Amino acid sequence: MKEPLQKKKVVVRHLPPSLSQSDLLSQIDPRFADRYNWVSFRPGKSSYKNQKYSRAYVSFKAPEDVYEFAAFFNGHVFVNEKGAQFKAIVEYAPSQRVPKPSDKKDPREGSISKDPDYLEFLKVIAQPVENLPSAEIQLERREAEQSGASKAAPIVTPLMEFIRQKRATVMGPQGLSDIRRGGRRTRVVSANKPSPRPSKRNSEKKKYVEKESSKNVPRKTTADVSSSKPDYRQSNSSGKELPGNETAAIIDSSPPGIALTMDSGKKKILLLRSKDRDNPDNPPPQPEQHIDTNLSRNSTDSRQNQKSDVGGRLIKGILLRNDSRPSQSSTFVQSEQRVEPSEAENYKRPSRPANTRAGKDYHTSGTISEKQERRTRNKDRPDRVMWAPRRDGSEDQPLSSAGNNGEVKDRMFSQRSGEVVNSSGGHTLENGSARHSSRRVGGRNRKEEVVIGEGKTSRRGSGGGPSSHEKQMWIQKPSSGT
């Protein structure tokens, strides 16, 4: 059975925080200098909040020395510089192990003077410092080295040699001739190859049909045209055809000789307007070249006729206004201004190309002849009942105003039924659409329009009926008034 291990290591606790190892040993050595073999001191930490005491570990050689040390230091009082007292406590250490002293020494200890790396370092330090040359000197040295040294030959791999040989065979004289022949062949093929979009003039068939103004015009052609929705092309005054997506209306009141072309599928139909149905002197349909040459003359004649029609309407209105009394003239001007706002707008608004306006009346171009027949029937009918505002005065005043209103309503009916309004610029408008017209109007016409504009009253204020001081009266309009 083993003997119990003898405890030789003690710990001294509760030492002052400011105590050093030298001060502690000065208290121990006078009496126990030769009795201990190992000492370890752990300094403390002094602070206002947490104060940590110092401690010391001492390992004695014999257990008797432990008893004697405990009898001497246990309860020993230490006083610091501030007068605080600290009572020491001697105990057995929890761990009795003590580090063993190492007797082995490192063989390299004290041999740095013989180390080769250290000796080379000393030589480098002993050499004088050399400044680097300037940049110009360095460039000159490099240029001299590059010029003197021979350039290394480029490395050629077998793959590069094979590619060079292949290019030489392809780009030889025979290869170049083959390439040129191939280029010529492609050019010839592209020249002989037909274009994907053949011209419409070559592919389409043209027919010339003479349009008659009588009631017996065959409606089968108009029905076919309206059902298939063809693209109309109207020739303008310069002889150029309008785009295919625009439509041109067939106008009965247009002057003779104006050519209208209609494209339906692959066939092109040219409509010619004849002056008189029963005229035996009508020339046969001419080819398109002769018709194009006469377009400019016909357009100038149509412009003159349109200008004369507009001037005649304005003069007629002025004469009627002068004959009637001021009250009648004011009512006439108001009614005329309400009914014919399109004529005033024709002279104020800028002109627009005929092809864009004609495109709006695409669906009504086939039924214009029927509408004109209805107008002729309405003119032949007996008297119609009209109303006119009644003012204080003689009975003949309502009659004249009723006549004027009847004329105005005839104009409204003609505009709503598709009658063409001719502007001074020579363009045609249908269905009362007078948004775009020419501004070319003489000084006389502008003054007359200003007079008409002054007498105009707002439609919102009137409410579409007679005012509070007017009375409604039904009058019979004579058939000769039209």
Swiss-Prot record:
GO CC annotation, single: nucleus
Compartment(s) where it occurs, according to its Swiss-Prot or TrEMBL record: Nucleus, Nucleolus; Nucleus; Cytoplasm
Sequence segments annotated as region (Sufficient for association with EJC core): 53-482
A GO MF label: mRNA binding
Alphabetical UniProt keywords: Cytoplasm, mRNA transport, Nonsense-mediated mRNA decay, Nucleus, Plant defense, RNA-binding, Transport
Region of interest: Necessary for interaction with UPF2: 9-219
Entry superkingdom: Eukaryota
Primary residence: nucleus
SUPFAM superfamilies cross-referenced by the UniProt entry: RNA-binding domain, RBD
Region (Binds to UPF2) location: 9-14
Start-end of Polar residues biased regions: 223-239, 292-308, 325-336, 414-435
Summary of the knockout phenotype: Seedling lethal. Reduced ability to degrade mRNAs with premature termination codons (PTC). Increased expression of not only protein-coding transcripts but also many mRNA-like nonprotein-coding RNAs (mlncRNAs), including natural antisense transcript RNAs (nat-RNAs). Dwarf with curly leaves and late flowering. Photoperiod-dependent altered development and stress responses; in long days (16 hours light), altered organ morphologies (e.g.
Ranges for region Disordered: 173-482
Keyword DNA damage: no
Gene3D superfamilies: 3.30.70.330
Record's note on what induces expression: Down-regulated upon Pseudomonas syringae pv. tomato strain DC3000 infection.
Biological process terms in GO annotation: defense response to bacterium; jasmonic acid mediated signaling pathway; long-day photoperiodism; mRNA transport; nuclear-transcribed mRNA catabolic process, nonsense-mediated decay; response to wounding; salicylic acid mediated signaling pathway
Record field: compositional bias (Basic and acidic residues): 201-214, 337-348, 370-394
Free-text function comment from the UniProt entry: Recruits UPF2 at the cytoplasmic side of the nuclear envelope and the subsequent formation of an UPF1-UPF2-UPF3 surveillance complex (including UPF1 bound to release factors at the stalled ribosome) is believed to activate NMD. Binds spliced mRNA upstream of exon-exon junctions. Involved in nonsense-mediated decay (NMD) of mRNAs containing premature stop codons (premature termination codon PTC) by associating with the nuclear exon junction complex (EJC) and serving as link between the EJC core and NMD machinery. Eliminates the production of nonsense-containing RNAs (ncRNAs).
UniProt similarity note: Belongs to the RENT3 family.
PANTHER family: REGULATOR OF NONSENSE TRANSCRIPTS UPF3 (PTHR13112:SF5), UPF3 REGULATOR OF NONSENSE TRANSCRIPTS-LIKE PROTEIN (PTHR13112)
Assembly, per entry: Found in a post-splicing messenger ribonucleoprotein (mRNP) complex. Associates with the exon junction complex (EJC). Interacts with CPL1/FRY2.
Protein name (Swiss-Prot/TrEMBL): Regulator of nonsense transcripts UPF3
